Amino acid sequence: MSFVNVAPQLVSTAAADAARIGSAINTANTAAAATTQVLAAAQDEVSTAIAALFGSHGQHYQAISAQVAAYQQRFVLALSQAGSTYAVAEAASATPLQNVLDAINAPVQSLTGRPLIGDGANGIDGTGQAGGNGGWLWGNGGNGGSGAPGQAGGAGGAAGLIGNGGAGGTGGAVSLARAGTAGGAGRGPVGGIGGAGGVGGAGGAAGAVTTITHASFNDPHGVAVNPGGNVYVTNFGSGTVSVINPATNTVTGSPITIGNGPSGVAVSPVTGLVFVTNFDSNTVSVIDPTTNTVTGSPITVGTAPTGVAVNPVTGEVYVTNFAGDTVSVIS
């Protein structure tokens, strides 16, 4: 007994490619049509004989090309019909087999939450949903769904005894989004004979980087995020701070004018105030996030302050002084 393995989609693709070849042949025939009647270059016998020879060859070419085109059309028709026939036969064969597979998987799925045979479902993109586990005996883990903005991608599903773990979903569109974890290798149920473990899927890539441009940016140095509101960017070259709306990633309002050479910036999780180090004026400016205006007078610290951080428990502010080799503490 002999068997033939056919992929109907590949047969249909081959038929389409063959049809394009036929189109190219017809184009070539049209271009060569003028060679069937070649005019003599002069009235002498030699020129007339050469023209007749070329014209004869052109006529023979057209005759052969017509036969090739006719054969090619029949070949494309046969290939297209074969693809359709194979597709119908495949669909007819798949239905009863799927019914048998459903009958086998139903009790296993009910008892273990996982089928015996079959691939796990992919997680829904934009939700960070984990991919489904593959079947106990055979099946690839589903891919994790991509995360929403700022959310990690979903973990890939585990493979069965035979199969590959699903790939982790990509993180949401934030530069620090965490990638989804890879799907676990397959393993046999307790008491079963273990087969070769499935290969864990690769973790998804981190989220894509979004570039924000604005006229107020002038040698931007530091950036800090207010957990309950805006993003603050220091512009060293213009002595200002730009405010970004994280919902739209666009600059909002006018730049906030502060000291000279603003460098570092930090937000207090205790008070919500924004602290900015002014490198050239040896001070720290404080911004009220509710009004986005400077509050009070600049606080004098050491020479050339750069870095700044806020203690999340006490609210104390720590400032590194680049040229003074000191650290200032603001209570």
From Swiss-Prot:
Keywords: Repeat, Virulence. It comes from the Bacteria. Induction: Highly up-regulated during the early stages of invasion of the human blood-brain barrier. Interacts with human TLR2. Induces maturation and activation of human dendritic cells (DCs), via TLR2-dependent activation of ERK1/2, p38 MAPK, and NF-kappa-B signaling pathways, and enhances the ability of DCs to stimulate CD4(+) T cells. By activating DCs, could potentially contribute to the initiation of innate immune responses during tuberculosis infection and hence regulate the clinical course of tuberculosis. NCBIfam families: beta_rpt_yvtn (TIGR02276). Elicits a strong B-cell humoral response among different clinical categories of both adult and child tuberculosis patients. Could be used in the serodiagnosis of tuberculosis. Expression of this gene in M.smegmatis leads to enhanced survival within U937 human macrophages in vitro, with increased host cell death and a marked higher secretion of tumor necrosis factor-alpha. Belongs to the mycobacterial PE family. PGRS subfamily. This is PE-PGRS family protein PE_PGRS17. It comes from Mycobacterium tuberculosis (strain ATCC 25618 / H37Rv).
